[in-house]
C-alpha cells in the first residue's frame, strides 16, 4: 500500500465510486483504530465481543456514511472514525446479539437482491491477518506497560488524532503540560519498543 496517498484523495476517490479507495483507507487506519477500540472497550465487553467485530461494524458504517463526510484537516478523518467507533462500542454494550446485527449489515453488500451494493472487501490473506494480529498484540502489550497518563495522551494524540490544544481541552490541562507529557510518553514508549525488539 502506498502510504503517500493522502486520506483526502482516498475519500474523494471513494465518493466518486472507487471501491478500492475504501480498501486502502481501511488498511491505512486499521491498526490505529484497532488500538483505539481495544482501549475504549471495557474488559467485560472485550470478553464477549471481539475487537475485530467492532472494527468491521465501524468500517461498514464508515463506508455507508462516507458520502456525507467532509474532509477538513489531516486529523478529521480519524476523529470521524473515532466517533463512529464510540457509537459502535456503546451499541455493542447494549446489544449482545452480535450475529443478528452482522447478518443485517452483510445484507447490504452486493447480492442478487441488492445488485448495486458494494462488493465485500477481501482485506488480507490468512498469513497477513495473523502477522497483523501478532503485531497488534505486541503494540497493545507495550502500551499496557505505560503509566495510564502516558497511555492516555498517546491514544488521544496518535490514535484519535487530536491536536495538543484539543487534548489540553479534553484533559483540562495546559497545552504546555500536555506537550511535555506527550513528549515524555512517546520517549518512554520508544524505549519500551526498542527493548521489546531486542528480546
Language-model regions: role of each:
Residues 12-16, 39-46, 59-74, 95-97:
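Sigma70-family region 2
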Residues 49, 53-60, 75-87, 180:
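Structural recognition of an alpha-helix C-terminal capping motif at a helix-to-coil junction
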Residues 33, 120-155, 162, 170:
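Amphipathic alpha-helical segment used for protein-protein interaction
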Residues 68, 86-107, 118, 132, ...:
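Arg/Lys-rich amphipathic alpha helix in sigma70-family domain 2
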Residues 1-31, 67, 119-123, 127:
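N-terminal module of bacterial RNA polymerase sigma factors
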Residues 34-37, 41, 97, 146-151, ...:
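Short, Lys/Arg-enriched C-terminal cap helix and immediately downstream tail that follows
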Residues 16-27, 35-57, 174-175, 198-199:
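Short, charged helix-capping/linker segments at alpha-helix termini
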Residues 139-141, 150, 159, 164-196:
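DNA-recognition helix of helix-turn-helix
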Amino acid at each position: 500500500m502506498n502510504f503517500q496517498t493522502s486520506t483526502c484523495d482516498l475519500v474523494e476517490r471513494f465518493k466518486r465510486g472507487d471501491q478500492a479507495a475504501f480498501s486502502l483507507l481501511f488498511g491505512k487506519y486499521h491498526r490505529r483504530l484497532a488500538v483505539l477500540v481495544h482501549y475504549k472497550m471495557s474488559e467485560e465487553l472485550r470478553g464477549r465481543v471481539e475487537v475485530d467485530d467492532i472494527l468491521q461494524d465501524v468500517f461498514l458504517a464508515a463506508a455507508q456514511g462516507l458520502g456525507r463526510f467532509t474532509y477538513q484537516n489531516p486529523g478529521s478523518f480519524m476523529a470521524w472514525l473515532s466517533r463512529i467507533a464510540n457509537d459502535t462500542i456503546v451499541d455493542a454494550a447494549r446489544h449482545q446479539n452480535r450475529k443478528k446485527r452482522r447478518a443485517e449489515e452483510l445484507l447490504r453488500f452486493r447480492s442478487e437482491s441488492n445488485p448495486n451494493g458494494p462488493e465485500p472487501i477481501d482485506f488480507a490473506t490468512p498469513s497477513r491477518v495473523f502477522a497483523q494480529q501478532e503485531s497488534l498484540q505486541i503494540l497493545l502489550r507495550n502500551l499496557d506497560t505505560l503509566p495510564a497518563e502516558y497511555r492516555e495522551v498517546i491514544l488521544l494524540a496518535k490514535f484519535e488524532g487530536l491536536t495538543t490544544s484539543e487534548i489540553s481541552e479534553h484533559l483540562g490541562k495546559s497545552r504546555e503540560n500536555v506537550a511535555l507529557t506527550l513528549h515524555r510518553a512517546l520517549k518512554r514508549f520508544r524505549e519500551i519498543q526498542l527493548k521489546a525488539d531486542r528480546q
